[in-house]
Amino acid sequence: MALKRIQKELSDLQRDPPAHCSAGPVGDDLFHWQATIMGPPDSAYQGGVFFLTVHFPTDYPFKPPKIAFTTKIYHPNINSNGSICLDILRSQWSPALTVSKVLLSICSLLCDPNPDDPLVPDIAQIYKSDKEKYNRHAREWTQKYAM
């Protein structure tokens, strides 16, 4: 079941990739993918290339894939281990979702952080109190780690 679904998602992704994103298997292991998100235009991450790992559980799509950034990023919802605080990767997961939709959601999280559900409270506080300082730090990290 999982393998068929993953193969279908892969062919859909290759035929119609989501904006600013790409993904595919690492070697021959269809349960382990690498994904790429280009920093969205008009965001502090513009120009950056961010890599993520995608691990599918054997009971996919009934359980969500484990997705994490391998590129360091300054963001209130993404911690230093690359873990992403995004409801659809946890409690709001649905088998109707696809890797493509999840990558687009991560992209929009880069444009619109959720400081009220932070993984990194310090960054969330800066985002809320001094947006210019937040954007400056995010741009610096993008230039340092994602270019």
UniProtKB/Swiss-Prot annotation:
Protein name: Ubiquitin-conjugating enzyme E2 D1
Localization annotation: Cytoplasm
Annotated EC: 2.3.2.23, 2.3.2.24
Keyword field: ATP-binding, Cytoplasm, Nucleotide-binding, Transferase, Ubl conjugation, Ubl conjugation pathway
Complex and partners: Component of a E3 ubiquitin ligase complex containing UBE2D1, SIAH1, CACYBP/SIP, SKP1, APC and TBL1X. Interacts with RNF11.
Species lineage: Eukaryota, Metazoa, Chordata, Craniata, Vertebrata
Origin: domain of life: Eukaryota
SMART domains tied to this protein: UBCc
Post-translational modification: Autoubiquitinated in vitro.
Gene Ontology CC annotation, any one: protein-containing complex
Pathway field: Protein modification; protein ubiquitination
Effect of S94E: Decrease in autoubiquitination
Function of the molecule: Accepts ubiquitin from the E1 complex and catalyzes its covalent attachment to other proteins. In vitro catalyzes 'Lys-48'-linked polyubiquitination. Mediates the selective degradation of short-lived and abnormal proteins. Functions in the E6/E6-AP-induced ubiquitination of p53/TP53. Mediates ubiquitination of PEX5 and auto-ubiquitination of STUB1, TRAF6 and TRIM63/MURF1. Ubiquitinates STUB1-associated HSP90AB1 in vitro. Lacks inherent specificity for any particular lysine residue of ubiquitin. Essential for viral activation of IRF3. Mediates polyubiquitination of CYP3A4.
